[in-house]
Amino acid sequence: IEVPYENVGKFVKEKDPIYDVLAAAAKNFEHNLSDLDASEQVRNYLVNERKISPQISKKFNLGYALKSWDALSQTLLDNGFSEEILIKAGLAKRNKEGKLFDVFRDRLIFPIKDRKGRIVGFGGRVMSQEDQPKYLNTGETEVFQKGRELYGFFESLEDRKNLKEIYVVEG
């Protein structure tokens, strides 16, 4: 049986820009959480209400999506990513007029990693009291299928030598 190596290589290379834009988005979200005055409420929520230390926040690459309709999209476009790749990665959508807008706005962001540690999607908890879903996940994409990934699994692999037990919970 002949194995089509060239096709497999092309398939992987086509996914590379998606992984790249997701990694760039994660860095942007992390920066927003750690360095911006606008995210002070979110930092306080993590530390005071959820008892999540800055060290744990950093380990899991937690971030914050600004309230703006297009802050992330504009940052990523300014860094050379195309509108098409933002949409393919599940980071942006188009409104009825065709204008690009961010999927995640005013949310605490949880990057979801695959078994190799690559960011494949995001979970976001709303921080405002507006009428919207409390949690929002990246939609299905070429690199993210919700049923295939387990949040925190990659991080648990890093710590497995120091753990006696692992609990898997929902919600």
Place the predicted regions along the sequence by residue:
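Phosphate-handling DNA/RNA-contact segment within nucleic-acid enzymes
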Residues: 10-25, 68-171
